[in-house]
Amino acid sequence: YMAEGAKDVLVLDGGASATYAARIEGSDKLEVRNSPSDGAEREVCSSLLIVSTAKSTGVFDHASLTPNNDLYTPGYEVQFSASGIDTAGFPMAVPADATWALADDSKDMGTIDAKTGLFKAGDKTGTVNVQMIQGGKVIGTTAVEIAVPDNIYFNAEEVSLGFEDESDLSLVVRNKDRDLNIKDGDIVWTMSTEGLGTFKGNTFVAHSKDSLH
């Protein structure tokens, strides 16, 4: 770190319990941004706080777009959303005349509704660069990936369910060690024992007690 130009370095707990929380652009809430070993922030902890004393200006600067850097299968419908950011980094309304568009290098990756931001992926794989435009100027950008699975497995050999319970059966779908969002129909499900339940998309729904004879 010193070689990179740091003058002072603090070494905190480097274990898996370390928790990072931040207020991301477009939000007024502090949220945990990593995956601590306990699954959540500990009730008792030592903390280092970085607090901004800036005040909202109410002057629009740019739009923060989500999702970002997520993976989806071909044909997936992705709903993009935007939050306005003022010059001090505080949330504000997005200009009413702002519209959605695909960047020139992504126009062959699918279609996007200019008003709603609903993107429908095509059959190609690769990066999709999405823009928000106002008055011919790009005021926000984000990107997602369209990919196919290279690893599909279950996290558990058995799953116990009650009547009418729903479960994803601990299915994990990944591409290059990253979680991949799949749509209904991407996986064809079969059961060795009929009558125990049905699939609703990629979710298994156990039958009710009355349905068993």
Q: What name fits each language-model region?
A:
Residues 101-118, 155-157, 182, 190-207:
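Low-complexity "stalk/linker" and mucin-like segments enriched in Ser/Thr/Pro/Ala/Gly
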Residues 1-6, 11, 17-59, 66:
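Conserved, well-ordered active-site substructure
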Residues 138-146:
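Edge beta-strands of extracellular beta-sandwich domains
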Residues 58-67, 150-157, 197-199:
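Proline-enriched interdomain boundary motifs that mark the N-terminal boundary
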Residues 125-136, 212-213:
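A short beta-strand micro-motif common to beta-rich folds, especially ectodomain repeats
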Residues 70-76, 159-165:
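Short, solvent-exposed loop/linker segments at the N-terminal edge
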Residues 76-90, 130, 165-179:
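Beta-strand-rich structural segments
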Residues 18, 98-100, 187-189:
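Short beta-strand elements bearing conserved aromatic residues within extracellular beta-rich modules
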